[in-house]
Amino acid sequence: MSQTSLKKERDPSILILDFGSQYSELIARRIRETNVFSLVVSNCISIKEINNINPKGIILSGGPNSVYEQNAPKCDEKIFNLGIPILGICYGMQLMVKELGGSVIPATKKAEYGRAPINIDQESDLLSDVQDKSIMWMSHGDSIKCLPVGFNKIAHTENTLHAAISNDLKKLFGVQFHPEVIHSEYGMTVIKNFVYKISCCAADWTTETYIEETIPRIREQVGNKKVLLALSGGVDSSTLAFLLNKAIGNQLTCMFIDQGFMRKGEPEFLMNFFDKKFHIKVEYINARKRFISKLKGITEPEQKRKIIGEEFIRVFEEESNRLGPFQYLAQGTLYPDVIESAGTNIDPKTGERIAVKIKSHHNVGGLPKDLQFKLVEPLRKLFKDEVRQVGAALGLPAEIIKRHPFPGPGLAIRILGEVNNEKLDCLRDADWIVRDEIKKAGLYNEIWQAFAVLLPVKTVGVMGDKRTYAWPIVLRCVSSEDGMTADWSKIPFKILERIANRIVNEVISVNRVVYDITSKPPGTIEWE
């Protein structure tokens, strides 16, 4: 069955035009939290494409540029005459004002960044139920000098005369603050007002409707052909395995490549869980010796990643040829991957988007072009939290759904320097203790990631009246919403003490434990 004959996928009710904002993805997530489907598209989208999608509302995102710059990104100005409600956020509002005959200038007082109370000047559907003098998050250096004809000022701050504007007749609205960020007290109220009161969207984007719509599409796309899935045991590939199994049953084969860098007990758990408990066909490939031999003498982290990725491809090729033939390859690509792959760079000469190379997915490590698979990517329009919801609805247990993120190269990049079996055994035991104690303390679901890192140095210690010279272990525990930024977790000292005592007493070759209290930025979550 050809791809073109497939039933049309659901169109977004709210379309988000991206002008390079760091928050565009967050806007989409916030709208979906209201049970309304939204997608992020390029600011260069054509009027014809918009009409084909027929959205209920459009949001113009913020962005790092100034609208009065020569090559500032724009959108087709006819968008404002479509009769579709539009909300401009920050740069999006300034662009709307400029395109409709108003004027934008550099801030006359000072740039406004951070929290600021807004003063509501008049009633508006956009600010309905928003409390006067509530805190909103500002991040702008330019301001509106003169509004276009038909617009009214509906809110201001101490430093911004036009904090929110409206043209009720044409249903055009703008806010200088960012309602999508958590710091804006009534931000979700503003978003809900635009989505429901102004755009009249239906709250029909739910986990149940997604599953109901997706399973028939998978069956239609695949037909009676065979599908191969590289299973890692993470929430993405696990959810995908359950979804495909529900849709096509025995046509699915999962391949689990054990490269030797998994956490303690995970290979056994995954095989027992998928193959024996839920009867999902999983081919176990023991490639531990191959991978560890390739890393002998390798200390540079990017080189380790590259070697692991290349070896994964080789193993995947060999085993897929042995088990096949397969006509389809299933990938757990998520919507953030799609957004990132589409590119967000602005050409300084033309002001248009620059296409960027599509990144390889971590589950398959960048497959070679001569593998003649057709792709099945049913999760490609979902965010991580939505994938977890789908997994829960399909029956995945909490121990997988709430599993902490784990890097594709596994423990190989949590061992700084050269990787060998002795270090892997040491780190596995230490890492298991960290997670065990965090779970016992009831903190596991409150922490984004909790793990151990093995350093490539040795330290002096004293144990049993004898001098020791052994490795130190670093504890890394962070709290985050999406992994883009993170704070180190303020774990009670008693729990840290218990973890440290267990590690130095139960793990051979470790005599010291330290706690990493670096946030991201400036640090990263992983050490390599």
Curated annotation (Swiss-Prot):
EC number: 6.3.5.2
Keyword set, alphabetical order: ATP-binding, Glutamine amidotransferase, GMP biosynthesis, Ligase, Nucleotide-binding, Purine biosynthesis
Entry annotation: catalytic residues: 90, 178, 180
Pfam families noted in UniProt: GATase (PF00117), GMP_synt_C (PF00958), NAD_synthase (PF02540)
A Gene Ontology cellular-component term: cytosol
Chain positions recorded as ATP binding sites: 232-238
Residue ranges of every copy of the Glutamine amidotransferase type-1 domain listed in the record: 13-204
Gene Ontology MF term list: ATP binding; GMP synthase activity
The protein's annotated pathway: Purine metabolism; GMP biosynthesis; GMP from XMP (L-Gln route): step 1/1
Reactions this protein catalyses: XMP + L-glutamine + ATP + H2O = GMP + L-glutamate + AMP + diphosphate + 2 H(+)
Sequence ranges assigned to domain GMPS ATP-PPase in this UniProt record: 205-403
Its biological purpose: Catalyzes the synthesis of GMP from XMP.
Subunit structure: Homodimer.
HAMAP family, per the entry: GMP_synthase
Protein name: GMP synthase [glutamine-hydrolyzing]
Gene: guaA
